Curated annotation (Swiss-Prot):
It holds the Pfam family Ribosomal_L17. Part of the 50S ribosomal subunit. Contacts protein L32. This is Large ribosomal subunit protein bL17. Transmembrane segments: none annotated. The gene is rplQ.
Amino acid sequence: MRHRNSGRSFSRTSSHRKAMFSNMCCSLIEHELIRTTLPKAKDLRRYIEPLITVSKSDSVASRRRAFNILRSKSAVGKLFTDLGPRFAKRPGGYIRIIKCGYRDGDNAPMAIVELMDRPVSSDDTEE
């Protein structure tokens, strides 16, 4: 029975899943826009939203908590210097998920995940 089991397994071990979402969070923080499958995009919200909420208060404990998930000094630095102040007034809903068709090959539903209020430049490309 599946009672009270939240989240998807994606046919991966728990350590693989943890590493995958850590890498996806780092990519989203670094590039502010990533392209992935729709189920992964929906589960990514569970990881990135609390990280951005933690980054609103810049303290050593907050940075350590974020580093424990991200494992990237550059991502933690950008999270606390750029994204924390940017979302200081926003009470939640830091990312936007946009459906973008189906992938060639296996017809998997794809989505673009982007940070809200991101600066738009003329040469933005999808990852």
